[in-house]
């Protein structure tokens, strides 16, 4: 075989063929269309060698088997027919692997996803390592697609239809022990003996498929199947609100294969794959995938980052505890927490303990590994142990004088090279750095709550922040598992600035008589994970509204909240979920009780009359203000590019991923159409809906953001 081949064949002395997967020049193995000829050439050699006893597929990469198919292949398809042909090519290749007359085993270490799992499913047996890096799944639904190389047909027959549907519909990834329990793999072994274990399995007859559990056998029959697909269909429709066509097609294709046989199933799979590849939802989801990949590669500045050997955190509250957890347990960097109250340190340590202990209980982590990670976190009530910290993250109250004091203390007690990163959500970084002796080492690092779950961070340099400080902070965020966007030091930064008018409009509609549940349901139907009122309750009404006066002072009355509404709510001791009462009432702590709207909220805020708006009208008012503000952020270079703007909105506030972010959504509607909608709303509801100048100009010229914009902050 050629040296540049991604698949190479070697035959051992015991007549076991080893096919090594190693895509040249890439960290991850991904399947490309041009590899088909390489695999077919190997299959031909295997068929011609009558001495062979078995075959093993193994990866040469240190941490992945095959991470999936190369998504660029789909983008290169111009029609549904071309994408369908791509799927049929994949199906045929997998069928040829499966048709080999000798046992074929997949030796899996690391990520085995998408097309990688489909290749493993085409093998007659699978062995995987017990390493935490080893995960198996079919995540195509997250790109608005379905598995196109036989996965929708082979997986249900191997592990049962209900379990397979859960995996395919959600993109759920299984760890090794889960995969073994479900029958997805035949054995789990240490990495050091993976190849030998796979070879031993290949020397035996083809592994016989293990009998499915009784429940799965019942569900595979006509009556059980009809009941299952009806129930799963309802549940899926409720979860997706009909916004993700891939889920409907997955159900259709899996059911076709079970009811009409694999031949019909494969045919339906290929056709559905081709059609889904051309949907705007899949195109938007793939754009988010590519954009997030680019952001993760972006170093933030041209300067080399400084070393990061240890980090300090000021404040042991909820944010401080979460930041300590991702720094120690995700980034693997030693962390020291300073809090004036020993109880604060204990809370922060308990935060990490709870996260890690949950992983131990779910068998995702060994107790010894938990203890090793916890040992990276320590605490103090003074600055002992801070002298040589490379970066300090401040997570204290939103008070400018306090944060300036923290800067002074860090400069006095830490090394000359130490970076000071403030987790402020609203205060200008330039003001925090105003009295610093080393202002070039002061930067904003805005996490979102809950820290361990929210993927986005905003990195905010002020005018005097050095390029190396930016690069080092970006480096830390990536190590913490975050997707960082660099934003300009202007009031509200980016995410809170586009979120505030969206929340304000929801509150304004409440005062006009719209119901809480109706507003929230309208935005969930639009595609947000939760509605704006529920979001405010979850964040904390006191916390979430604190930024409104800051934004109003900076940008004028378009950011003003309805008069006295917020103060009335806060004066009634309503903070949201954290104290059990906000717009909603919550059950006892520790119980998963249903929240319900508190009817007392309406007289409290002076709501009058009955709501008259439809769900689309409610969503339109909230979303249009968000879009308008996002365009202003591009115009003012608050964000470096529309790419960052889309990623920030999707990862920071849950803007519907299937729409691709605010800028792709504007492009899909057309800037001219957005301007027309906003002008109509301005006539009906006031000047806050006046479209910004940039949007009007683009509408007049018929321009779109993703084709014309490439702004960069200097």
Curated annotation (Swiss-Prot):
Its EC number is 4.2.1.17, 5.1.2.3, 1.1.1.35. It holds the Pfam family 3HCDH_N. GO terms for cellular component: cytoplasm. One of its GO terms (molecular function) is long-chain-3-hydroxyacyl-CoA dehydrogenase activity. Pathway: Lipid metabolism; fatty acid beta-oxidation. It catalyses: a (3S)-3-hydroxyacyl-CoA = a (2E)-enoyl-CoA + H2O; a 4-saturated-(3S)-3-hydroxyacyl-CoA = a (3E)-enoyl-CoA + H2O; a (3S)-3-hydroxyacyl-CoA + NAD(+) = a 3-oxoacyl-CoA + NADH + H(+); (3S)-3-hydroxybutanoyl-CoA = (3R)-3-hydroxybutanoyl-CoA. The keyword S-adenosyl-L-methionine does not apply. The record marks 118, 140 as: Important for catalytic activity. One of its GO terms (biological process) is fatty acid beta-oxidation. Keywords: Cytoplasm, Fatty acid metabolism, Isomerase, Lipid degradation, Lipid metabolism, Lyase, Multifunctional enzyme, NAD, Oxidoreductase. HAMAP family: FadJ (MF_01617). Catalyzes the formation of a hydroxyacyl-CoA by addition of water on enoyl-CoA. Also exhibits 3-hydroxyacyl-CoA epimerase and 3-hydroxyacyl-CoA dehydrogenase activities. This is Fatty acid oxidation complex subunit alpha. It comes from Escherichia coli O157:H7 (strain EC4115 / EHEC).
């Amino acid at each position: 075989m050629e040296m540049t081949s991604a698949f190479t064949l070697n035959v051992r002395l015991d007549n076991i063929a080893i096919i090594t997967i190693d895509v040249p020049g890439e960290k991850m193995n991904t399947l490309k269309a041009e590899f088909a000829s390489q695999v077919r050439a190997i299959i031909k050699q295997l068929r011609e060698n009558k001495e062979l006893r078995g075959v093993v597929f193994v990866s040469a990469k240190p941490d992945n088997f095959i991470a999936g198919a190369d998504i660029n292949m789909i983008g290169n398809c111009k029609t549904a027919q071309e994408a369908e042909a791509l799927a049929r090519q994949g199906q045929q290749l997998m069928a040829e692997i499966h048709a080999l007359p000798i046992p074929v085993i997949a030796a899996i270490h690391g990520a085995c996803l998408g097309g990688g799992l489909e290749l493993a499913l085409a093998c007659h047996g699978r062995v995987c390592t017990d390493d935490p890096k080893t995960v198996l799944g079919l995540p195509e639904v997250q790109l608005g697609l379905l598995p196109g190389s036989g996965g929708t047909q082979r997986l249900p027959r191997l592990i049962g239809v209900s379990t397979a549907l859960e995996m395919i519909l959600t993109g759920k990834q299984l760890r090794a022990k889960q995969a073994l329990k479900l029958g997805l793999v035949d054995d789990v072994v240490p990495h050091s003996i993976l190849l030998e274990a796979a070879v031993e399995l290949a020397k035996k007859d083809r592994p016989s498929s293990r009998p499915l559990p009784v429940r799965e056998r019942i569900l595979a029959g006509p009556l059980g199947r009809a009941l299952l697909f009806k129930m799963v269909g309802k549940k899926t429709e409720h979860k997706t609100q009909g916004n993700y066509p891939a889920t409907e097609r997955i159900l259709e294709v899996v059911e076709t294969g079970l009811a009409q046989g694999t031949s019909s199933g494969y045919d339906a799979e290929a056709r559905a794959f081709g059609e889904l590849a051309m949907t705007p939802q899949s195109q938007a989801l793939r754009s988010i995938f590519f954009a997030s990949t680019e952001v993760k590669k972006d170093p933030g500045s041209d300067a080399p980052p400084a070393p990061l050997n240890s980090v300090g955190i000021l404040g042991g509250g909820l944010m401080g505890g979460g930041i300590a957890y991702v720094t120690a347990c995700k980034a693997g960097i030693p962390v020291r927490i300073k809090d004036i109250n020993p109880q604060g340190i204990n809370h922060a340590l308990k935060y990490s303990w709870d996260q890690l202990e949950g992983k131990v209980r779910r068998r995702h982590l060994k107790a010894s590994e938990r203890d090793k990670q916890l040992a990276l976190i320590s605490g103090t009530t003074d600055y002992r142990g801070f002298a040589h910290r490379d970066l300090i993250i401040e997570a204290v109250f939103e008070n400018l004088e306090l944060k300036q004091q923290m800067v002074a203390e860090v400069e006095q007690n830490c090394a000359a090279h130490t970076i000071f990163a403030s987790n402020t959500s609203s205060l200008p970084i330039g003001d925090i750095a105003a009295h610093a002796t080393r202002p070039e080492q002061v930067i904003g690092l805005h996490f979102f709550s809950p820290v361990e779950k929210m993927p986005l961070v905003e990195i905010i340099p002020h005018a005097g922040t050095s390029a190396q400080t930016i690069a080092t902070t970006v480096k830390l965020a990536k190590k913490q598992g975050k997707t960082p966007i660099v934003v300009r030091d202007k009031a509200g930064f980016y995410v809170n600035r586009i979120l505030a008018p969206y929340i304000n409009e929801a509150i304004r509609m409440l005062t006009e008589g719209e119901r809480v549940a109706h507003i929230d349901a309208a935005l969930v139907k639009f595609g947000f994970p939760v509605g704006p009122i529920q979001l405010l309750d979850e964040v904390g009404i006191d916390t979430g509204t604190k930024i409104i006066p800051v934004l109003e002072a900076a940008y004028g009355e378009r950011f003003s909240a309805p008069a006295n509404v917020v103060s009335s709510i806060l004066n009634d001791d309503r903070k949201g979920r954290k104290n059990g009462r906000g717009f909603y009432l919550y059950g006892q702590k520790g119980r998963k009780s249903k929240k319900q709207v508190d009817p007392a909220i309406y007289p409290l805020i002076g709501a009058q009359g009955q709501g008259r708006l439809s769900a689309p009208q409610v969503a339109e008012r909230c979303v249009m203000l968000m879009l308008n503000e996002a365009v202003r952020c591009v115009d003012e270079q608050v964000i470096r590019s529309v790419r960052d703007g889309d990623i920030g909105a999707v990862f920071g506030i849950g803007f519907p991923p299937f729409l691709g972010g605010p800028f792709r959504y504007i492009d899909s509607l057309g800037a001219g159409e957005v301007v027309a909608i906003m002008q109509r709303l301005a006539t009906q509801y006031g000047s806050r809906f006046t479209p910004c100048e940039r949007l009007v100009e683009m509408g007049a010229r018929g321009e779109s953001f993703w084709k014309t914009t490439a702004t960069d902050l200097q």
